Amino acid sequence: SYESGKVVDSYGGGICQVSTTLYNAVLNAELEVLERHNHTMIVTYVDPSKDAAIAEGLMDLRFANNTDYPIYISGYAYGGELTFTIYGHETRDPNRTVEYVSETTGTTTADGVALYATDQPVGYLSQTQGALQGLTAVLWKYVTENGETTKEQVNSSTYQATPVCYDVGVNTDNPTVAAAIQSAIANNDLDQVQ
C-alpha cells in the first residue's frame, strides 16, 4: 500500500491489483465506467492510466452494464495470476477492433529525501525505497471498424514523484541526540542523521 508517499505493508495491500485487473476487463468489454481513480504513485504491474485504485470510503471502482443483455463476470486466481472474464451477447461487428494505448504526457522527479523514524538505535540508517518518477498520462481508446479508426480519451492520470526514503533509528537515552535526530527527520536532512 501507499502511505504518505511511501510503500508500506498493510492489511489489504495489493487489493488494487484485483480492481486494476477488473478495470481492464471492463474496458475490454466496453462497459460504462462510472468511477475510477489512479494510484497516488505509479504502479509497475500495468501501464499508466490502466490502473484502478480503491480505498475504503475514499475511492472505488464502479461500472455499469450499458449493453442490452445481461453480463456474467468470472474471476479466478491460479498460479500467481488473476483473471477476470466478462461474458455477454456481442452485438457489434465481429471485425471491429478495440485497442487501449497509454500515452505519457509529462514526467516529474522528486528532490531530496524522505526520512522516517524507527525504533532502531540511533545510528541506524536504511534505504527502504528508491526514488519514483512522477508522471501524467492519458489512456486512449482506438476503435477500428469498416476501415475507419476513431480515437477517444478514456481518462487522464497524475502520479506523484517520490524521493528516496530512509528509515532512521531514533532509540536513545540522550535527549539532546533524540531532539537532533527528530529535527533532522522533520526537515528530511540526511546529512544531519549520518
Could you say what each language-model-derived stretch is?
Residues 1-194:
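Well-ordered beta-sheet/strand-loop patches within structured domains
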